[in-house]
From Swiss-Prot:
Organism of provenance: Methanocaldococcus jannaschii (strain ATCC 43067 / DSM 2661 / JAL-1 / JCM 10045 / NBRC 100440)
Highest taxon above the source species: Archaea
Protein name: Uncharacterized protein MJ1503
Cysteine pairings via disulfide bonds: none
Pfam families found in the cross-reference section: TrmB (PF01978)
PANTHER family in the cross-refs: HTH-TYPE TRANSCRIPTIONAL REGULATOR TRMBL2
């Protein structure tokens, strides 16, 4: 089995689907993150060309990645005037730390939630709408 797949009783996770879930982004945004991470600070047009996507699609993905804290925008000043932006991905190790921390929080919250469930409340919730 691939190291990028995780089978659980409910589903099979891919790393990009896990990133999408943790960071609230689209699976397609993850490709943009890894392109920037691999190639270093990049302009939107360069990213779009490398991954064969429309500029506007890449712009939306980069905005999602910035909102999630995975990518930062930096202004580069041109010597004779003007500027342009490049986008830089946070290091992969930092991304992994955030994912692990988020998963630990989820796990702790789920354990607490299950611990606090009362049988009577669960029965009432799931059986009250059943017609006799």
């Amino acid at each position: 089995m691939s190291k990028l797949l995780l089978k659980t009783p409910c589903t099979t996770w891919t790393f990009d689907s896990l990133m999408a879930c943790v960071f609230g982004i689209k699976v397609s945004d993850v490709k943009v993150y890894f392109d920037i991470l691999k190639n270093g600070p990049s302009k939107i047009n360069d990213i779009a060309e490398r991954i064969n996507r429309d500029r506007s699609t890449v712009q939306r993905a980069v905005q999602n990645l910035m909102n999630a804290g995975l990518v930062k925008r930096k202004q580069v000043n041109i010597k004779d005037g003007g500027y342009y932006y490049v986008y830089e991905a946070i290091p992969f190790e930092e991304t992994k730390k955030i994912i692990k921390k988020t998963m630990e929080e989820w796990c702790n919250n789920m354990k607490k939630w299950v611990e606090e469930l009362e049988f009577e409340d669960v029965v009432k919730e799931y059986l009250e709408n059943i017609e006799e």
